[in-house]
Amino acid sequence: MLLIPAIDLRNGLCVRLLQGESDKETVYSNDPAAMAVTFEEAGAKRLHLVDLDGAFQGEGANISSIRSILKNVSIPVQIGGGLRTEEDIDIMLALGVSAVIVGTMAVKHSDVLEKLLKKYTGEQIILGIDSRNRKVSIEGWKESTEIQDVKFALRWKNSGIKRVVFTDISRDGMLSGPNLAALREMAEHTGLKIVASGGISSIDDLEQLKNS
């Protein structure tokens, strides 16, 4: 199991939101690059970035912060949030991120994602599944669908996806522990590599994930 620190970016700051609510924000740092370096120095082997401005508005406001992070760390960096066009993906991968996470695109622009999975590898394109009551949410969690999360993962596995970042929205930012049952079902039914996101706050949570 690999522990991946996450940095949520909003207006160039490191923040945390409660259940993705934009008005429930806590700012942790005004220097994302320094935060990334701190994580690497602590032993992180990979970083996960979320562009919240991109997720909420469809266009990012954190490109300078992302560039600075990439310049200052030597470990792989993956990013998600607002990546909804082929150009968005091309730009991020050209910047030097190791992988991009797509969610809304997989629902609304499946033809574009199919094309990208032929252009790049299944390790460079990661499927982001944001789940509320086991149904996929998109557009920065503002829009709900009737798509069941496991079926969604299986559909994209058939197109070449190898890895899923699974977020239980009800747990995100709450420090209440991950949804182990949902994560176990996702792993067992799909055979994909699963990144557990949302609610993880303690060594005990990590031990449970490792043993589940």
Please name every model-derived segment:
Residues 1-3, 43-46, 73-77, 97-98, ...:
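Short, well-ordered coil/turn segments that N-cap beta-strands
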Residues 8, 39, 47, 79, ...:
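Conserved, mostly hydrophobic/aromatic
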Residues 12-15, 19-23, 93, 97-172:
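Conserved anion-binding
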Residues 13-60:
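N-terminal beta-alpha supersecondary unit
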Residues 28-40, 84-90, 144-155, 206:
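Short, acidic/polar
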Residues 46-64, 165-177:
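Glycine-rich, proline-tolerant flexible connector loops at the mouths of alpha/beta enzymes
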Residues 60-67, 142-151, 176-184:
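Charged helix-capping and loop-helix junction motifs
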Residues 70-73, 77-100, 181-212:
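Catalytic cores of alpha/beta
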